[in-house]
Amino acid sequence: MKTKFNVEVYITEKVDLVNPFVKNRLKYALFPKDNAVTSSIIQGWQYEPYMFDFLKKNCIETYGKDIVDVGANNGNFAVEFSHLVGDAGKVHSFEPQRIIYYQLCGNVFMNGLDNVYCYNVAIGDRDGVAFIDKPDYLSLENVNFGNVSLKGEFDYNKTDIVDMKTLDEYDFNDVVFIKIDVQGYEPNVLIGAKETIKKHRPYLFVEFEEHLLIENNSSEDLLKKQIEDLGYIVKRFQEGIPYQTESGKCLDCVCIPIEKESLNHIVP
């Protein structure tokens, strides 16, 4: 399977709210006021590089595998993951925000990626629908469109309705790792992924954000125990500690299947 096709981008009129951007031969349509992932792309550095460092330093084979990206945002990881899995692998990118999903699809298309599959779906612990914050995408203020959470009730002006599914509903092939960054909804994603995790035993890259977990009736401690109960060892990137209770920080962790711990992984 050839995973890359040729795309030429023609800009006929400047749009103030969405800018085309090319860096290192990668193409992106970006909200210039998005101050998180977008700013890293514009400045030319890789967002959360320790995920890729972990895979590289531990010589983890990704070619021909599946990568699952839950909370795909604008596709910056999807583009990078596409090159990791190569012609024989697939990247499955899930993004519940309708407008950001369109952006994700556009960036996948502009880079000519045939091995990335995009889904406008909220991943959780059940099959149904979910309500999600609808930020002001026309705002000229600095914002973080990745900092959007699922809500308990519908508000016509402030929320969108999106389908919710579990990861276990999908038929993946040889999953090497799953990235989960869903603003406090990580425990629910894991509940709906038990069979997928049991079958593939992938590495997990999980975001711990205490105040968002508390809003979802969980915590860093509870999330860590939930992952350990699945047969994983939780290690925190960068500082070498698993978690920091009531930290108020956003903590990114790598979760290693306990049966692979003897490999003495290097954690960046």
Positions of predicted regions on the chain:
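S-adenosyl-L-methionine
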Residues: 1-114, 154-157, 233-241, 245-268
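Short, hinge-like loop/turn segments at secondary-structure boundaries
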Residues: 109-111, 133-139, 220-225, 253
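Hydrophobic pocket-lining residues within nucleotide cofactor-binding pockets
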Residues: 72, 123-125, 182, 208
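Core alpha/beta nucleotide-donor-binding catalytic domains of modification enzymes
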Residues: 105-137
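Short, charged, solvent-exposed linker or helix-capping segments at domain edges/interfaces
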Residues: 40-41, 130, 140-148, 262-268
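Short "lid" loop at the C-terminus of a central beta-strand within the Rossmann-like core
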Residues: 97-100, 122-125, 210-212
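Conserved acidic-Pro-Pro-aromatic motif
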Residues: 16-17, 89-93, 168-268
